[in-house]
């Protein structure tokens, strides 16, 4: 059999055979359980009284999108060469890594391949393209700088901590043949890198000159891109090779010829900060809930809000509060132990669980629950995990699963809650907040017009506005802020030149134009 015959063992190459036996792993489809896995095991046990392999990866069969076995006669077979031509090898590989555990059947569907390609590969490529765009504008060469960890901003240190934790997780999962877990760790990191780090750091790349903070941002993102490319190289070999050739080989002739000749990244344990990662994860959860509360209140993110109250089991430092305020466009974030001033709770019994437990007492339990001080009852439930009632001298103990809990919001406030966090938005808007919302909308509309007019990222422009006294007044009052945001040298009112467009901004109609200088 192959492990023995390939080296003509036992007639020669005894030392070579012993170095390679047993194999670290063997991989075949499930239909080879008897024909291959068992045959090898039987022969090896007979000859050596030991298994010929240390690990087995059994691959499930590939089915069509409806879970049916592929068959030419049924017409549901997919030509692999057509699929490769349509989606690319990397996208198909990534689909198989993430769709299910290797030993389970895989339902192959083009739309699923495209979705995986968009969520991971597209996000990674867009982040890489962002870096390349601004690196070319600034003639940035990573070989001329070093990553000075002690000089980095908190966001930089957080990204590097996430990076090293990810590399560690990928290495551990691959070493233990947990392929989907390794792929999902990479996908989670790339999502954080693109949709949080880059989005929060854009203005650092836009800054003039090459100050230390801008260098730090470049070097942090460069390090993350190169490292994640190396970690993902075994899974998406072609895209990562492109990234490596442009980011590394093009500026360092001494680097290995290919990313596949590089060592797998080593983990920098001293960069890993679990507390920082936990705090940022808590922050992100608050931001997600804050956005949901805004949607419930039907208030766009460009409209500033006065205050958000947060009730949670943790506290965040002022640094993280500032990020929340900026991300949610909120003036103040207040952590509170009690939010009874803004919301109230009411309780009903969950018939499915309370009925079998207490039967005839069900109606009395329902009546007692309706008379409770909802906020005190919720506090008891959260602190002890149960709610105790006294009904006809009998102690009734209800768990959270026994209760239907309704949260009512006070007028002028909107809340979102999960098991550990509640956020409450004060939706009362002052005239000053409303005017600031107009400014945000104006900046957004001007940026849209820049793109539609085909202006380059760094082009200076002149902005025009007419036909609405309120909008014109706001643009005059906040001219410096607007000009700074849209790279404008001047705001002209009462006339228009260049690319012109009519807008309806918060029910105010205005004509605006942009002109390249």
Task: Locate the predicted segments by residue.
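Feature 926 captures the class I aminoacyl-tRNA synthetase adenylation module centered on the KMSKS loop
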Residues: 1-2, 47-85, 104, 113-517
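Alpha-helical recognition segments enriched in aromatics with Gly/Pro capping
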Residues: 1-106
